A protein has these predicted regions:
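Ser/Thr-rich, low-complexity intrinsically disordered terminal regions
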Residues: 1-138
Length: 138
């Protein structure tokens, strides 16, 4: 049988080597923290229904895991965002899309999952939304 999780995801073979790694998003010049926060929260809530941590003062957002079930596997994904202070007084954020995979037979308990170095295609839009709604560089 085809590896559905592999086919439904992107990895370094497609130049998307972002799973389980922090990458930076720098906000457009002049963007306020308020606007950035609203846009980040919007991306988090739209793509991951359950936001577990939303601490505006600390500039930290963390979603709950979202499970995606395939015939033989379960992939779970979550988003974490932390404000990052750069020397140039630029507003930027560290973003991590965590991805883990389990055999469906094992179930959904934490010990069934291991890190998965691919991001499900349905979360590709999260990466582009971060770029377009906040800033440019990665």
């Amino acid at each position: 049988s085809a590896d559905e999780a592999f086919n439904g995801s992107m990895g370094s073979d497609e130049g998307v080597d972002l799973a389980n790694k922090f990458f930076s998003v720098t906000c457009k010049k002049g963007m306020t923290e308020d606007i950035a926060w609203k846009r980040l929260m919007n991306i988090a809530v739209t793509n991951f229904e359950n936001v577990e941590v939303r601490d505006k003062a600390a500039g930290w957002i963390k979603t709950g895991w979202v499970n995606t079930t395939f015939t033989y596997q379960i992939v779970r994904t979550r988003l974490e965002i932390q404000v990052q202070f750069t020397e140039e007084n630029e507003l930027s954020y560290r973003v991590k899309i965590s991805s883990e995979i389990a055999d469906k037979d094992c179930g959904t308990s934490n010990q069934c999952f291991s890190k998965y170095d691919r991001i499900l295609r349905k979360y590709e839009s999260v990466i582009s939304e971060l770029q377009t709604s906040l800033g440019s560089n990665f």
